[in-house]
């Protein structure tokens, strides 16, 4: 019985939060509800940049669309979903109530999933294309790891700025979403005005 009461209280809290979010102006509500899409679009851009850099290094000239679509689509979807699960949903349900925690979660999501993951994803995609079209001399079985580390170093150096930009943007977006949620929670309910 106690679990049922706790669950009912939790549902009331979620309903109250969503009702107050709906009172925000449309632009602010849009940022609060769809912020993960913006982070996902930045991750897709990071994926396309990493794909382009690896294609140049490995001299891959064929299958531009076949490599570009997954390098934009997969980082977008994973970053959008991860940001929604770790930042947006806990904020909207009241489980994430600390600004520092929100900034840390959103920044780490931007760094790991939105920045580093697309670069690591570009390695097998373009390595497979280089092997298929024989555009670059690939290593033998003994020195595969050292080859990919050596090949990836210039890409990671060039991707440093987009990765840092993605991290800072995600952290800033998390901070703004937290401030908007606090603003929404401080709004008075229509019809429940205090005199």
From Swiss-Prot:
The chain crosses the membrane at residues 34-54, 57-77, 111-131, 159-175. It comes from the Eukaryota. One of its GO terms (cellular component) is mitochondrion. It is found in: Mitochondrion inner membrane. Residues 1-33, 78-110, 176-195 are mitochondrial matrix. InterPro entries: TMEM126. GO terms for biological process: mitochondrial protein quality control; mitochondrial respiratory chain complex I assembly; optic nerve development; protein insertion into mitochondrial inner membrane from matrix; toll-like receptor 4 signaling pathway. The keyword Transmembrane helix applies. Keywords: Membrane, Mitochondrion, Mitochondrion inner membrane, Transmembrane, Transmembrane helix. Residues 55-56, 132-158 are mitochondrial intermembrane. Protein required for the cotranslational protein quality control in the inner membrane of the mitochondria. Associates with newly synthesized polypeptides and may act as a chaperone that cooperates with OXA1L for the insertion of newly synthesized mitochondrial proteins into the inner membrane. Required for the assembly of the ND4 module of mitochondrial complex I. Belongs to the TMEM126 family. Interacts with OXA1L; promoting cotranslational quality control in mitochondria. This is Transmembrane protein 126A. The gene is TMEM126A.
């Amino acid at each position: 019985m106690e679990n049922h009461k706790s669950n009912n209280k939790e549902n009331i809290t979620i309903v109250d939060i969503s009702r107050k979010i709906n009172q925000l102006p449309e632009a602010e509500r849009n940022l609060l509800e769809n912020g993960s899409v913006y982070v996902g679009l930045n991750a897709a851009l990071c994926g396309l940049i990493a794909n382009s850099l690896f294609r140049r290094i490995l001299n891959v000239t064929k299958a531009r669309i076949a490599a570009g679509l997954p390098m934009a689509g997969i980082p977008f979807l994973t970053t959008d979903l991860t940001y929604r699960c770790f930042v947006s949903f806990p904020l909207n349900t009241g489980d994430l109530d600390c600004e520092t925690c929100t900034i840390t979660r959103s920044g780490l999501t931007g760094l790991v999933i939105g920045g580093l993951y697309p670069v690591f994803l570009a390695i097998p995609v373009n390595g497979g294309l280089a092997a298929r079209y024989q555009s670059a001399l690939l290593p033998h079985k003994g020195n595969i790891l050292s080859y990919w580390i050596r090949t990836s170093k210039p890409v990671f150096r060039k991707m440093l700025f987009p990765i840092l930009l993605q991290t800072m943007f995600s952290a800033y977006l998390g901070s703004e979403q937290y401030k908007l949620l606090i603003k929404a929670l401080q709004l008075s309910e229509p019809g429940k005005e205090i005199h």
